[in-house]
């Protein structure tokens, strides 16, 4: 979808660039596939802030997305394309031929009225879901399962995709947008195409308040705090902290490696860096 640039009627609109959503559904989500969510503001059950920079934001309804696509061999028709406040990509409401409704991530170039299916016998068309075993090498895919049957976890945000590089010994190698190459079981499923809303990376919020609507609070520098609040705090006048960069809890930061090895790390063929 094209970008929408506003005239500078006010200072807050001067820098705003948004994605044009005029072609999306303008009504409310399907009631049986939506539920309310409560905001915590980053607090735990004791009322203490455990996640910094989280605010309330605008009230939202959570759309229950089908990441598994486990309704096999039944065609579905795309009823409408909707905006989802909980994610960067758009979502599609689909109606199966047996009358059931479901929300899925909307791939790029998926239109209202298109027919899609989750089947290993399906054609390689945008929106169809197949196992990696039957998807041809070189195909662009998204919503990829790490563990078969768990549901898609890779390439779900706006404009993202992965490329199927090759298959060998029960595993497929996929290349992610970050440059990382991973081995995934051939029994895992993925959806053909790239995720919608590719222009999301080009938006500009234009003012701090628009970011607050998303539930994000301001980020304060440690050197601007008092010593009781941060190791970099205090000092006479403006100071540079006087020590190597650390977190509020005294651990080294800015270059300190924090990633811990997981069981799935063994499936990384090539690191993103």
From Swiss-Prot:
Region: Disordered; residue ranges are 224-260
Q: Gene3D superfamilies, alphabetically?
A: 2.30.30.30, Nucleic acid-binding proteins, Ribosomal protein L2, domain 3
One GO term in the molecular function aspect is: structural constituent of ribosome
InterPro entries according to UniProt: NA-bd_OB-fold, Rib_uL2_dom2, Ribosomal_uL2, Ribosomal_uL2_bac/org-type, Ribosomal_uL2_C, Ribosomal_uL2_CS, Ribosomal_uL2_dom3, Ribosomal_uL2_RNA-bd_dom
Under the heading SMART domains, the entry gives:
Ribosomal_L2, Ribosomal_L2_C
Q: Record's Gene Ontology CC terms?
A: large ribosomal subunit
**Entry superkingdom:** Bacteria
**What's one GO BP annotation on this UniProt entry?**
translation
Basic residues bias locations: 251-260
As given in the record, the signal peptide range reads none
What UniProt keywords apply to this chain's record, in alphabetical order? Answer: Ribonucleoprotein, Ribosomal protein, RNA-binding, rRNA-binding
NCBIfam families per record: rplB_bact (TIGR01171)
Annotated HAMAP family: Ribosomal_uL2_B
User: In UniProt terms, what function does this protein have?
Assistant: One of the primary rRNA binding proteins. Required for association of the 30S and 50S subunits to form the 70S ribosome, for tRNA binding and peptide bond formation. It has been suggested to have peptidyltransferase activity; this is somewhat controversial. Makes several contacts with the 16S rRNA in the 70S ribosome.
Q: How does it assemble?
A: Part of the 50S ribosomal subunit. Forms a bridge to the 30S subunit in the 70S ribosome.
As for family, the record states:
Belongs to the universal ribosomal protein uL2 family.
Instruction: Return the PANTHER family for the record.
Output: LARGE RIBOSOMAL SUBUNIT PROTEIN UL2M (PTHR13691:SF5), RIBOSOMAL PROTEIN L2 (PTHR13691)
Protein name listed in UniProt: Large ribosomal subunit protein uL2
* Naturally occurring in which organism (per UniProt): Orientia tsutsugamushi (strain Boryong) (Rickettsia tsutsugamushi)
What taxonomic lineage is listed for the species of origin?
Answer: Bacteria, Pseudomonadati, Pseudomonadota, Alphaproteobacteria, Rickettsiales
Q: Which gene encodes it?
A: rplB
């Amino acid at each position: 979808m094209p970008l929408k640039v506003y005239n500078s009627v006010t200072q807050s609109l001067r820098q705003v660039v948004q994605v044009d959503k005029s072609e999306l559904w303008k009504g409310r989500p399907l009631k049986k596939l939506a539920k309310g969510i409560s905001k915590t503001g980053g607090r735990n059950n004791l009322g203490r802030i455990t996640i910094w920079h989280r605010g309330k934001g605008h009230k939202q309804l959570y759309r229950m997305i089908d990441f598994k696509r486990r309704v096999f061999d039944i065609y579905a028709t795309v009823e409408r394309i909707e905006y989802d406040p909980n994610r960067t990509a758009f979502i599609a409401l689909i109606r199966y031929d047996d009358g059931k409704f479901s929300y899925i991530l909307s791939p790029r170039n998926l239109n209202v009225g298109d027919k899609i299916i989750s089947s290993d016998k399906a054609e390689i068309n945008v929106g169809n879901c197949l196992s990696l075993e039957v998807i041809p090498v070189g195909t662009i895919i998204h919503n990829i399962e790490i563990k078969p049957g768990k549901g898609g976890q890779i390439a779900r945000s706006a404009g993202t995709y992965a490329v199927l590089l090759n298959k060998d010994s029960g595993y497929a190698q996929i290349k992610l947008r970050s440059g990382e190459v991973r081995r995934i079981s051939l029994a895992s499923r993925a959806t053909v195409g790239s995720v919608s809303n590719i222009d999301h990376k080009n938006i500009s919020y234009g003012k701090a308040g628009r970011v607050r609507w998303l539930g994000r609070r301001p980020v304060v520098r440690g050197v601007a705090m008092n010593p009781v609040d941060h190791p970099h705090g205090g000092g006479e006048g403006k100071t540079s902290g006087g020590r190597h960069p650390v977190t509020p809890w005294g651990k080294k930061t800015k270059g300190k490696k924090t990633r811990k090895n997981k069981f799935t790390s063994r499936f990384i063929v090539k690191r993103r860096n």
